[in-house]
Each structure stands twice: as C-alpha cells, then as structure tokens.
Amino acid sequence: NSNAAGQFATATGAGSIAVGESATATGRASNAAGTYATATGADSMASGEEATATGQGSQAIGDKATATGRRANATGEKATATGWNANAIGEEATATGSNSQAEGRRATATGQFARALGGNATATGQFSTASGENATALGQQSAAYGEYATAVGQGSVATGATASAFGQNANATGVGATALGQNAQATANNATAVGAGANTAGYANATAIGAGATNTAANQMMFGGVTTTYAAPGITSAASHAAQSGPTNFVTSDGGGHLATSNYGPDNIAGLSGAVNSLGMNVASIWQSVGNLQRSVRRGYEGSAVAIANTAPTISRDARFGVSAKWGNFRGENAFGAMAQFRVNPNVVLNGSLAVGMRYGGVGGGVGGLYEW
C-alpha cells in the first residue's frame, strides 16, 4: 500500500511513500521525503527540500539534489547526477554520463566513466579522471592527479600539484611540471617540455623546447634536436647592442651543442689586431733593413769589381805612353775601368786609373808610380 503524509503529498505505487508538503512518490517502493521532493521510478528515493530522483533505483539526498537515470545518485545540497549509475556526492557536485562520478564540493564529471574527485575538480571526457582539489582533466582518457593539476587533450596525464599537460598523450609528472605538445614528456619536479615529443628525460628543473628536444642533465635548457636550425633576427638590432654593457665574449659550442662563452671577446680581438698590425709594421721595417743590407752587400761586391777594373799591367820599357781598359766582375756585380801610364825615364813610370760600377754607379780611381832598376 502507498502512503502520503503532508499537504498535497502524493504516493503512487505499491509501497510508495511521500512525506512532506507537495511531496510526490511515483513507482513501486518509491520514497519522497521533503517539501516538493519528487521520486519517480521503482525504488527511487528523494530526500530533501525540492530533491528530485528520476529513474529506477535513483537517489537524490539533499536540498535541491537531482538524480536522473537508473541508479543515479546525487548526495548533497544541489548535487546533480545524470545518467545510468551516475554518482554525484558533495555540495553542488555534478556527474553527467553513465557511470560518471563526482565527489567533492562543486566537483564536476562529464562523460562516460568520467571521475572528478575533490573540491572543484573537473573531469570532462570519456574515461577522464581529475583527482585533487581544483584538478582539471579535459579530453578522452585524460587524467589529472594533484591539487591544481591540469590535463588537456586525449590521453594527456598531469601528476603532481600544479602539474600541467596540454596535448594528445602529453605527460607532466612532478610538482610544477609542464608538458605542452603531442607526446611531450615533462617527468620531474619543475620540468618543462614544449613541442611534439619534447622530453625532459626525468631531469628536475630541466626545459626541453622544440620537436624531439631531449634533456641530458638537470637544470638544463635544451633547444631542438640535431636537425634543428636556429634564427634570432633581433640579435643584430641596435636595441640588442644597446642592451649590452661591459665586456662582451664569444659564444662557443662543443659537439653536443653545449653552449658557453669564451674567455676572450671582440675587445681582445681588436687588441690582438692592433698587435698584429704593429708586428706587421715591425716586419716591414725588418724587411726594409734586410733590403738595405742586401743593397749594401751588393755595393760592396760592386766595389770589389771596381777595384779589379782599376788594375792593368805595366807598360814595357820600350814604350813611352800606354792606355788600357778592363772589365771587372765580382759575385755578379760588374765594373768598367781605364788606366793611363807614362814613362818618365827608363826607371820611373807614372799611372792613373778610373773605374765605374755598372749597377749602382760606384766610382773608384787611383794614381801611382813605379820605380824599377
């Protein structure tokens, strides 16, 4: 037998019970308890002011709680469960979709088998899971575990307080970890991976930027991979130069792409350039000195040739006067000379000679006499 107690209360169905003003219970063993409470469906139960349970075995417990669907359960003030076996537990918790589950104040689960566990947790998408205060999972099979953890994208996973994963199969594991891009992997505390397939490889405080970039050490920033090229148009701007202060050094790289700065820079090169220029001037001066020395040596050779050209045999006793000419050569230098001889008497001969070098014009001469008996 049905039982209705309260002004305008209505109970319809074997074993149904409606208790409260305008309470309504419809269906076998349905139960509505509370002002304007409504239970519709066999074994349904609505308990609380304006609570509503619709569907076989559905249950709404709490003021303005709403459960819609077979075995749907909404427990808590303004809790809402919609879908077969949907379960919303907590003030203003909302579960939408078959087997969805929202537990915690204002937790929201939307999608088949979606699970939001924790205050303000939000899970949206089939098999999505958000576990932790203010955790958010958006996308099929996405998962966020930890306070303020966020996973957005199919198969994305964020594990750890404030961890964030954005992109299909992106994975951020660690406190403060961030993964952005398809298959990006940030797998340590405060690690950051940006780009498709970027991977911090388990190193803490590491940052990998660019498709396929992979860290090799903690506290490292890795940009791209072995096929990556780099461009920074602003590096040549006047503003960039103006932003620099103090000594500047050159950037160096080893075979693994590890960057550092040299112990020297443009100022050192400028100083070295000055030293090289000074050395060049010194070398030029040395070469000039060498040239002068070479000329002096050649002049000496020419002097030897002049000396040779200044010699001549003595005239015979029968001759009164004689003139001779001679070509002299010494180590490649040449001279031409002439000599005049005069016999004063049978025993005395006077002579004079003059010779000229053919390259440098060196002149040599002499006078002399011969006494014979």
Q: What is the predicted role of each segment?
A:
Residues A18, A32, A60, A74, ...:
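Alpha-helical heptad-repeat coiled-coil segments that mediate oligomerization/polymerization in large
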Residues A9-G15, E21, T26-R28, T35-D43, ...:
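Small/polar residue-rich beta-strand/coil "junction" motifs that cap repeat-based extracellular fibers
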Residues N1-A4, I17, Q101:
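Extended, small-residue-rich solenoid/repeat segments and analogous flexible loops
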Residues G255, N263, I269-W373:
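Beta-stranded membrane pore/translocator domains
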